[in-house]
Every structure is written in structure tokens, then in C-alpha cells.
Amino acid sequence: MFRIGQGFDVHAFEEGRPLIIGGITIPHEKGLVGHSDADVLLHTVTDAALGAIGEGDIGRHFPDTDPAFKDADSAKLLEYIWKIVEDKGYILGNVDCTIMAQRPKMAPYIEQMQNRIAELLHAEPSQVNVKATTTERLGFTGREEGIAAMATILLMKK
């Protein structure tokens, strides 16, 4: 049996915060705003996994009104959800991710992101695809106000 899930997330830039995407800290003058560490890519993968197993979304499991998740490491949140995925008897088929950002350029960090996500999902890097695009200076990402990401995941019954 196969299950498919989709995730989407957006975070605005803010000075004085680190920029963490896909579990990798990227040098940039601004980071992303969020209750947790605001890792827009790991949030989309988490939401995609939750959607695939019919368990709602990241906000249901880790509400931004709960102080326990203030500045939480998104990798830890994904690990928690991935245990639920595995407990339900699923493994990763593949996950395909897209980051939408005008700046900074993501290309130098894509392989590291893929490796980190594969590690978190107990999978091979070949099962994880991360790509990045600009929005040709259109919209909030084009104006460099923030970053968006989306992911589609395929789970397979063990």
C-alpha cells in the first residue's frame, strides 16, 4: 500500500536569527521568523508525512501557542513524527522538495540538505530530492521578504 502526502510552508525573514533550511545553517544576514527554529523545509516534509498518514498537520502536533516548542529544533519535531510513521508500518518511498527563495542561493547546500533529510527519515539520500527556484522577483519571496517551500512524499507499507 502506498500513501502520498503534501506539505507547504512559508516564513518571513527577520534580522538576528540564524537561517536554518533542511537542517543546515546557511550564512545569511537574516533568518526566518517562527515559534520554532522556523526551518521552512523540514516543516514541509513534516506536514507531508503527517498528511500521508492522515494525522493532521504540524500545528496540531506542535502548536505555536505551546511554550514547550519555543525555538524547537525542527529536526527533533520531524524525528518525533517519523517515529509515528514507522510505528504505523510505513517507510519512505521518496520525498521531493522545492524551496522558493530569491536569496540566498541554495545550490551550495542542496546535497547537505538531502543527506540530513535522508538521515532523519532513515532513508538513502537517493530517496530525497531537494531543488530550489526563485520566483523571478515576483511576490514576497521575490521581494526577499521570506522563503516558501513545498514537499510531496510517498510512503510504502513495510
UniProtKB/Swiss-Prot annotation:
SUPFAM superfamilies tied to this protein: IpsF-like
Keywords: Isoprene biosynthesis, Lyase, Metal-binding
Binding site for a divalent metal cation: 9, 11, 43
GO biological process: isopentenyl diphosphate biosynthetic process, methylerythritol 4-phosphate pathway; terpenoid biosynthetic process
Reported cofactor(s): a divalent metal cation
Cross-referenced Gene3D superfamilies: 2-C-methyl-D-erythritol 2,4-cyclodiphosphate synthase
UniProt cross-references to NCBIfam families, sorted A to Z: ispF
Residues the entry annotates as binding 4-CDP-2-C-methyl-D-erythritol 2-phosphate: 9-11, 35-36, 57-59, 62-66, 101-107, 133-136, 140, 143
Intrachain S-S bonds: none
GO MF term list: 2-C-methyl-D-erythritol 2,4-cyclodiphosphate synthase activity; metal ion binding
CDD domains to which the protein is assigned, alphabetical: MECDP_synthase
Role: Involved in the biosynthesis of isopentenyl diphosphate (IPP) and dimethylallyl diphosphate (DMAPP), two major building blocks of isoprenoid compounds. Catalyzes the conversion of 4-diphosphocytidyl-2-C-methyl-D-erythritol 2-phosphate (CDP-ME2P) to 2-C-methyl-D-erythritol 2,4-cyclodiphosphate (ME-CPP) with a corresponding release of cytidine 5-monophosphate (CMP).
InterPro entries according to UniProt: MECDP_synthase, MECDP_synthase_CS, MECDP_synthase_sf
Free-text cofactor note: Binds 1 divalent metal cation per subunit.
Organism: Lysinibacillus sphaericus (strain C3-41)
EC number: 4.6.1.12
PANTHER family noted in UniProt: 2-C-METHYL-D-ERYTHRITOL 2,4-CYCLODIPHOSPHATE SYNTHASE, CHLOROPLASTIC
EC primary class: lyase
Site (Transition state stabilizer): 35, 134
Catalytic activity: 4-CDP-2-C-methyl-D-erythritol 2-phosphate = 2-C-methyl-D-erythritol 2,4-cyclic diphosphate + CMP
One protein family per Pfam: YgbB
Similarity field: Belongs to the IspF family.
Pathway named in the protein's UniProt entry: Isoprenoid biosynthesis; isopentenyl diphosphate biosynthesis via DXP pathway; isopentenyl diphosphate from 1-deoxy-D-xylulose 5-phosphate: step 4/6
Protein name in the entry: 2-C-methyl-D-erythritol 2,4-cyclodiphosphate synthase
Top-level taxon in the UniProt lineage: Bacteria
